Amino acid sequence: MFTEYTGNRQFDLQLNRTFATILDRAGMETIAATTLPRLRTTSQITKLAQGLAERFSSEGDEDAAWRLHELAAFYLGADDPRKRRFIDAMSASFDEAHRSLALTRHAVPFGDGELTAMRWEADPTDRAQAPAGTPTTLIMMNGFDGYAEEIIDFASHFPTRPFDTIAFDGPGQGHTVLAGMPLEPPWERPTNAVLDYFGIESAAALGVSFGGYLVTRAAAYCPRISHVIAFDMMYRLLDGLTAPLPRPLRPIADAVVGNPRPAWLIDAALGTASRLSADLGWKLQQASHLTGLSRPSEVLRAFGDYTMEPLEGRITQPCLVFAGDADQYVPFERLGDVRRALENSASLDVRAFRHAQDPDMAQHCQIGDLDRAFAIMGDWLQAAPMKSLRNSIRG
């Protein structure tokens, strides 16, 4: 269930993302009812998450601790020494919490560095019972602000796991960007590096958040991807900056972000705006971290490369696309553009959710009901190989 704790959509998304799975712990209902609604600043969130992470770790509850360590790091800039300390603690707690599982860490050679990857072996019983044609490997792609640990943990929401699951931090993501490797547009390159490292000839691919765009880019140029899941859709990365604006203002904002000149004026305007909006301030901070660029005008130009427009007609795999009209990062009206970009897909299954009828599933990445979202994905992955109708559209 998605809970509006503070009334700040950005804060509420991150709080639901972290707290949804730990509300059953002692004292957490009280914190959710009395403490979370009073949060007003990113520093308050950091302080609360750090304190709770340390508490749960001292109690031996590492499954709760790693989630809270990640939240403690979330709003910190890359130059804050606490960020790396919290992320290291997150990784240590995650490994301790999952040491009984068939889950391993890997360093995938890429360029002059390495990509962080994690592999979770399929459940043998689930694999034996899966329909013929079910993918044997699922690649999970990170997004704008996650880490490989969180991405692979999403797989625990599948009702069954008949496939090996591999999550990775590509350039500009998670552990990889902390090591100094910035974001790059040709996402087929890190995807191919991961497939080569594990010796995989065919795999389904699932992109989370910004990964909903990245997975389509990879699929357009990587024929080893057999199935595509956009969880949820993302037609254009720049929409994340303009989506929160009132609809009449979006064309003006689009013109500015599409052509950020004069640079000095854009830099000054966004610098002022980011001080007035915690959401925009965080987005620009994170965007600078991902790209390695310091000026907002440079970031906007770089983000212009991340759009599905040039991919139109190139993606031929079966595709499953999620969309919600309460998504704070992706305008719902982009669904038509996404359909057009995927018009040559072997099949197109769109699951569109509206807040009035389905508020939990209408949020970004269906964060209000992950079990249901992953049940849909699991069913689709096991049924998609048997589809014969080209461009069958649902939703």
Go through each PLM region and give its residues:
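Alpha/beta-hydrolase active-site loop
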Residues: E150, G180-I200
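Conserved alpha/beta-hydrolase
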Residues: F158-H175
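Catalytic histidine neighborhood in serine/cysteine hydrolases
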Residues: R340-M361
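Short alpha-helix in the alpha/beta-hydrolase fold that links the catalytic acid
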Residues: F154, Q317, P331-A341
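Short beta-strand/loop motif that positions the catalytic acidic residue
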Residues: I315, V321-A323, D327
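N-terminal cap/lid segment of alpha/beta-hydrolase-fold proteins
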Residues: D80, R84-A130
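Catalytic active-site module of serine/aspartate enzymes centered on a nucleophile-bearing elbow/loop
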Residues: A356-P359, Q363-G395
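The serine-hydrolase catalytic nucleophile loop
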Residues: F144-S156
